[in-house]
């Protein structure tokens, strides 16, 4: 990593140019200072890049977060005094799903380079996010002759394997919907061409080495993070006030996020049916979807409601849509249990936020986060495809008061100790600047052995 030991020169004269400039690239979805979380392709990754950008700004850098401009979006969006969203047009005015956006990125790169040169901008390095932005990031890196660090967030080979295992009868349709062949071809080129690949979990690191053929020295592991100034536990009295505001009664199980098949809300409903048979006070609250759902999202929501009806759970399951960003910490606190039931999940930002808020959490085994936690100490994990396993696991904190208290207390402690955005931004800068720094997580020590005597 010798080429990262010296930051690039600064030649512009504006006030902000006293600080080194970084280019983050996240091309798909609705990237904004206040994004409509839950909208198409707008979820945990958007939160990730925004929080990373903010922390890099607080650490003394000026950050331009590049994305695609479409619909009626403005060219710029100011996040704070050090961070702005820069929107570059390509592919017309309509929304384009992330699976097919790469076909328009040559135009995007040409427009981005034109913008950078026109404004005499000099960047120390590029950090791209997801494979579509990786295509763009590598082209800009080569044109500008600056380092390119790529964060995949999700891996095509891993996702394809998971989906073919979970839905073998639908395997023939996946290529048309998810464009795996082109995606994996581009991933192979990006990962071998960029200066460093940043894995967010040990699962990703393993796949990058074993399936993509990368050398270990070409990969650095930095986990996702959360904002510890927003997500933290509160007193019981405050929590009861929050519950009243949301109208929560009984023992509330919460799930939230985008309306997508891979999120496994249908599996959660099945598992909840097992819990509801054993715990009469159990209630399920699904805060899923966005303000303006597309046809596919509407279909998924209708299917979920039909599933609830077929199981006779209408009086125990509530649906709400978009949760405003300012309400996220409180809805986590209001719940008695949070469940991440994804069919596949590279990490699971929502689970970390829930743990940080003091809410006991159940995590899918089909992803990276469960390897970071100690079962029964920080959180619980289950196989969402096994409704009995998921249902019984959800029941445990409600039946064992000591376990509930431990998960609330130690889950929040685990999140604070390993997953704050400040530590993650510092890891990225240490990597770029060639400084030696203790990893946020050693891949061999993601979860210490469980100890009942905490």
Curated annotation (Swiss-Prot):
| pH dependence statement | Optimum pH is 8.0.
Record GO terms (molecular function): hexosyltransferase activity; mannosylfructose-phosphate synthase activity
Under Enzyme Commission nomenclature, its number is 2.4.1.246
Which cofactor does the UniProt annotation name? Mg(2+); Mn(2+)
Q: In which pathway does it act?
A: Carbohydrate metabolism; mannosylfructose biosynthesis; beta-D-fructofuranosyl alpha-D-mannopyranoside from D-fructose 6-phosphate and GDP-alpha-D-mannose: step 1/2
Task: Please give the SUPFAM superfamilies that the UniProt record associates with this protein.
Answer: UDP-Glycosyltransferase/glycogen phosphorylase
Q: Name one Pfam family in it.
A: Glyco_transf_4
Q: Which InterPro entries match?
A: Glyco_trans_1 (IPR001296), Glyco_trans_4-like_N (IPR028098)
Summarize the record's induction comment: By salt.
For this protein, the record's CDD domains field holds:
GT4_sucrose_synthase
Keyword Transferase tagged? yes
Q: What is this enzyme's catalytic activity, as reactions? A: beta-D-fructose 6-phosphate + GDP-alpha-D-mannose = beta-D-fructofuranosyl alpha-D-mannopyranoside 6(F)-phosphate + GDP + H(+)
One of the protein's GO biological processes? disaccharide biosynthetic process
Keywords linked to the UniProt accession: Glycosyltransferase, Transferase
Family per record: Belongs to the glycosyltransferase 1 family.
User: Protein name, please?
Assistant: Mannosylfructose-phosphate synthase
């Amino acid at each position: 990593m010798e080429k990262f030991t010296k930051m690039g020169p600064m030649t512009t004269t504006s006030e902000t140019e006293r600080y080194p400039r970084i280019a983050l690239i996240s091309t798909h979805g609705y990237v904004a200072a206040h994004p409509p979380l839950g909208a198409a392709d707008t979820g945990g990754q958007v939160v990730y890049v925004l929080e990373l950008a903010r922390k890099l700004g607080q650490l003394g850098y000026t950050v331009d977060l590049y994305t695609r401009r479409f619909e009626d979006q403005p060219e710029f969006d100011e996040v704070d005094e050090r961070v702005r969203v820069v929107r570059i047009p390509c592919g017309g005015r309509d929304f384009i799903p992330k699976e097919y956006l790469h076909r328009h990125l040559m135009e995007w790169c040409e427009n981005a380079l034109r913008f950078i040169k026109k404004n005499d901008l000099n960047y120390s390095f590029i950090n791209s996010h997801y494979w579509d932005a990786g295509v763009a990031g590598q082209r800009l890196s080569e044109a500008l002759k600056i380092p390119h660090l790529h964060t995949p967030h999700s891996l095509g080979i891993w996702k394809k394997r998971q989906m073919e295992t979970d839905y073998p009868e639908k395997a023939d349709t996946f290529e048309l919907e998810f464009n795996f062949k082109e995606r994996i071809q581009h991933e192979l080129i990006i990962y071998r061409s960029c200066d460093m690949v940043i894995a967010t979990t040990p699962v990703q690191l393993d796949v990058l080495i074993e399936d993509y053929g990368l050398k270990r020295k070409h990969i650095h592991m930095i986990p996702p993070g959360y904002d510890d100034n927003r997500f933290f536990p509160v007193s019981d009295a405050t929590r009861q006030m929050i519950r009243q505001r949301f109208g929560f009664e009984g023992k509330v199980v919460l799930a939230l996020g985008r309306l997508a098949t891979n999120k496994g809300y249908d599996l959660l409903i099945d598992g909840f049916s097992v819990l509801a048979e054993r715990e009469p006070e159990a209630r399920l609250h699904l805060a899923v979807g966005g303000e303006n759902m597309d046809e596919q999202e509407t279909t998924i929501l209708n299917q979920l409601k039909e599933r609830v009806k077929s199981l006779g759970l209408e009086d125990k399951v509530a649906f709400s849509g978009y949760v405003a960003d300012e309400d996220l910490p409180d809805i986590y606190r209001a719940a008695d249990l949070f469940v991440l039931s994804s069919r596949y999940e590279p990490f699971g930002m929502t689970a970390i936020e829930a743990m940080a808020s003091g809410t006991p959490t159940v995590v899918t085994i089909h992803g990276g986060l469960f390897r970071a936690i100690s079962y029964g100490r920080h959180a619980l994990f289950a196989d969402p495809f096994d409704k009995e396993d998921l249902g019984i696991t959800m029941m445990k904190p409600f039946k064992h008061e000591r376990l509930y208290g431990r998960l609330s207390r130690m889950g929040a402690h685990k999140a604070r100790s390993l997953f704050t955005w400040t530590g993650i931004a510092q890891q990225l800068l240490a990597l770029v600047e060639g400084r030696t720094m203790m990893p946020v997580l050693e891949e061999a020590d993601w979860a210490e052995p469980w100890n009942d005597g905490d």
